[in-house]
Amino acid sequence: MAEFELDRSQIRRSFERAAVGYDAAAGLQQEVCGTLLERLEWINFSPKVVLDLGTGTGQGVVQLRKQYPKAQLIAFDLAESMLKRTSKRAGWFRKPGLLCGDARRLPLADNSVDLIFSSLTIQWCSEDLVALFSEFARVLKPAGLLMFTTFGMDTLQQLRQAWAAVDEQVHVNRFVDMHDIGDALLAAGFKDPVMDVERHLREFGSVTEVMRSIKAMGAHNVATQRARGLMGRQKLQRLQEAYPCSEAGRFAVDYEVVFGMGWMPEVEPLDGGVEVLLRR
């Protein structure tokens, strides 16, 4: 077994259950998605086919439709209930195509997509980022663009450290360092990747509220090595005592959000008219 594996069926169940109340609980996701969309506006790019990978309830795909009114839009998600929410949100006019599946094995043809837009999804399929990004590269056209956000390694650090003081089991998902993400993009064939980080802080009145908020957005522990069973009152008390608390009695949660983008190499003709793939 790998050092850290994600339980795909558990991820799907988590987001299937979270779909109904997702918009009310996922303020952070909505904020990050909005920022990524704003950054996309600054790029001089006119894609014909756009894939919203990990569409959730459709915030991204609705805005992408406004930004690229002539593009074919595809909303992709692991959870069917999320896609149903997306369909309702998108309305009847120019409804996007809906695809349900695993991002590691996209049901799309080679060189078929101009833009992959993905906000806070990659962390749920991050065991082998080179393989994941290689799959994205497969479906992207030459000169295609990958624009994404994902959680960085310092996400939920307070909760992780508190659990480490309680026992040695896996209670918190592992997130990947920004530099490793950039290296994986290069290894998968993307050129000139650009990476940066934003930090978001949320505060709660108790550790129970912290864990409830994480679960409500579908982001609780989904590692195959995760601790099983219900948490007893004594363990919860130990966790609360180990969790750093401010003088005002507030429990902070850090989210490190990594923003990334990378282009596929262009195809340029030789003098004889033969096209070759340029890797710079």
Model-derived regions: residue spans:
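A short SAM/SAH-binding and catalytic strip from SAM-dependent methyltransferases
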Residues: 114-128
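N-terminal, positively charged/glycine-rich alpha-helical extensions of SAM-dependent methyltransferases
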Residues: 1-21
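Class I SAM-dependent methyltransferase SAM/SAH-binding core
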Residues: 49-106, 131
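Conserved alpha-helix/loop element of class I SAM-dependent methyltransferases that forms part
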Residues: 27-48, 63
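A short acidic, Gly/Pro-enriched loop at the edge of an enzyme's catalytic core
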Residues: 104-115
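C-terminal lobe and adjacent flexible extensions of AdoMet/dcAdoMet transferase-like proteins
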Residues: 209-280
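A short glycine-rich, Lys/Arg-flanked "PGG" loop and its adjoining helix->strand segment in the class I
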Residues: 130-142
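Conserved catalytic/acceptor-binding region of the Class I
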Residues: 141-209, 216-230
